[in-house]
Amino acid sequence: MATESLKSTPPPSSSSSSSSTINPPSSTHKYPSTSTNKYPSTNYSPNYPSTSKSWSFSSKTSLSNLKDSLPENPHIYDFSEISKATNNFLQKPFSSSSSSVSWRCSLRGKELILFQRKFRRQIESPELQQRLLAICRSHHSSVIKLLGATTSGNYIYLAYEYVHGANLATCLRNPQNPSYTVLSSWLSRMQIATDIANGLDYIHHCSGLNSEFVHNHIKSLSISVTEDSLNAKICHFGTAELCGEIVGKEGSSSKNFGRSNSKVMKIEGTRGYMAPEFQASGLTTQKCDVYAFGVVILELVSGEEALRYVFDEGGGGYKRISVIERAREVMAVGGGELRKWVDKRMKDSYPVEVAEKMLLLGLECVDDDPEKRPDMGLVDGRVSRLYLESKNWAEKIGLPTDFSVSLAPR
């Protein structure tokens, strides 16, 4: 589940006046379950005007004041607990799919990943209470569960269950052995696509949150592939909501973004996965998640990176190659171009008609016009049907339909 090398920023001191004092809950509740980049960075951080600034989470709205009012308490950790679990934050950071620093540790007898995130805007107590409760109550087999949180100063610390495995980007493109992939069969990739579609549909429509809930971090680095079973789980569920990345309709209106006395808010994204409208305005919607999922579909079919740069010997610089542009070229040319584009490490063993349908679906999801992108519920249904077609194909030609693979380095 690790590919990015993370740089830790010193965590705020627990003695800071702005830090919230968080007491452990009175009763215990348990909840279920890198390589060096040689090319220009794909991390994207445009600046957009906003009326917000860097916010601290004051003791007035601290999580400790919320825990007693939550009918099913998430774990509200004391800051001293996470400090002890991470050896006062001196423990080697866990290399994860996030651009924020994280640690693998044990809290209250449970192995987890602790992420340090900075608040992006002020979140009032009732709003944070509603978000935290709904997110921690949510359960789906394809979504990594948020177990609890704590706050200190400008930071929120989010504790997610630890999943044994590797991220999808590493499974598709092993930096130590590019010619090898654990996802060497078509059916294994369709299983991954189905799991992600199921999980994202749940996040958008069934998680108990509002009808416009957005994940905002969908990419191959943010998908964990479990060891042995090769199932996919979506990471960072609820991060955008709890950190204040998602601005509501009122707060995101054009008049607010046009105020001359506005501050500048940094909007972060990953090149190759950002929808055009997000790049233009910094505002994210569910259709931005659909766009990012479409990119992941194209990655699964081709094995290619969402965006890469290769050295152009003729021009003396770097040439940009987008998986979306390549997919559009393949569709435009037609004929045998699809067979040339599909990941050769699957050894030409896949149902061609299903591969064509997956290519079409991926391109629909990355349409430049968000109104033309399908809803995630429709996408989930189509991917599930294509998975069944793939399974029937595999059974007819006698291929195994169950997977048990080690993700250890090769």
Give, region by region, the residue ranges found by the protein language model.
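Glycine-rich ATP phosphate-binding loop
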Residues: 98-120
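Short beta-strand micro-motifs within the conserved protein kinase catalytic domain, predominantly
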Residues: 145-156, 164-165
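Structural motif in protein kinase domains
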Residues: 163-179, 305, 337
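Activation segment/activation loop of eukaryotic-type protein kinase catalytic domains
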Residues: 216-273, 310
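Conserved catalytic-loop aspartate of Hanks-type protein kinases
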Residues: 289
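C-terminal lobe substrate-recognition/regulatory segment of protein kinase catalytic domains
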Residues: 324-371
